């Protein structure tokens, strides 16, 4: 499994790229492989991770599960609403788990929104060679025309509370933040833009 390096054109043109574009045919050639999946809320990170688990038999770690375990156990006073603070708190833990998996030649999918834009600076080349990265993001047009459908799928893989404050404006701003943030960090070619057929966009 590998990721195609030439998807930046599609990102700049705001056209959707399906996830299979990122995947090479022979994933078995890799002894160890870490796949990082991030993106705005409701973009389908957990759905994609679950599908990769089923297809490639890679275990996956939900950063949301780690977050809630730490919050519920009283190990932090942060709340689920403290996004930036949670990224600062959770990422050092997650990155060391990733390093441990690479060192032990273990495959792992990590999914969640708490991956910083500059995540690469925390890994030496020996680790980066084994890490692949995807960010899922929706265009404003897609959100406006599919908002009810997006909300209806928010518990497709795992049960979660309906976000009463989730609005078109908020979702649009969140997705734009991810697109702009990862572009500025040099990750533009790794952003999967969802602006048409959702199933085609996240197909693996």
Describe every region a protein language model picked out.
Residues 86-128:
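Glycine-rich phosphate-binding loop used to anchor ATP phosphates in small-molecule kinases
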Residues 37:
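Hydrophobic anchor at the beta1->P-loop junction of P-loop NTPases
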Residues 44:
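Conserved glycine(s) of the Walker
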Residues 50-93:
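Conserved substrate/cofactor phosphate-moiety recognition/catalytic segment
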Residues 130-177:
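A glycine- and Lys/Arg-enriched "phosphate-lid" helix/loop adjacent to the NTP-binding pocket
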Residues 176-204:
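NTP-dependent small-molecule kinase module
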Residues 41:
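The conserved Walker
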